[in-house]
Amino acid sequence: MHVLSSVLAVSAFAAMTVPVHALDAWTIGVERGLPTYALTSEAGEVRLVCDPDRVFGPTPNGALVVRFLKDAAPDMVVVLAKSGEQTRLPVKNGISAQATADAADWAKMVATFRTGGEFALVTSADSLTFETAPLPDLACE
């Protein structure tokens, strides 16, 4: 009969009780020739549509599409990174268009997604929180 040492038994028990937190995974795709990145939770979803090559002309066609369970028609969304960085983007019908957003705010939002980690999208009535791996190749400016 093999007897485990008390240290080994305690270590094994501790390893079993440590919760494993899975990162939220971006779903990456292409729509109408534009790269897309989507995150979904029970509380809503966010989809980023990028236009790094100006597929449809010189005007950027990027968009941040948001859906909140408790706030169907926000007019502003704030992207908050755990590091303290934040950016405000105007929203109309659930969409913040890159062409009409402030370029510096759009760049901060992209940097937050590119860096990964924990971040939240917040409206006056609802919020979505995600924790993702970095997206170092995200080209969405």
Model-derived segments and their meaning:
Residues 81-141:
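Internal interaction segment
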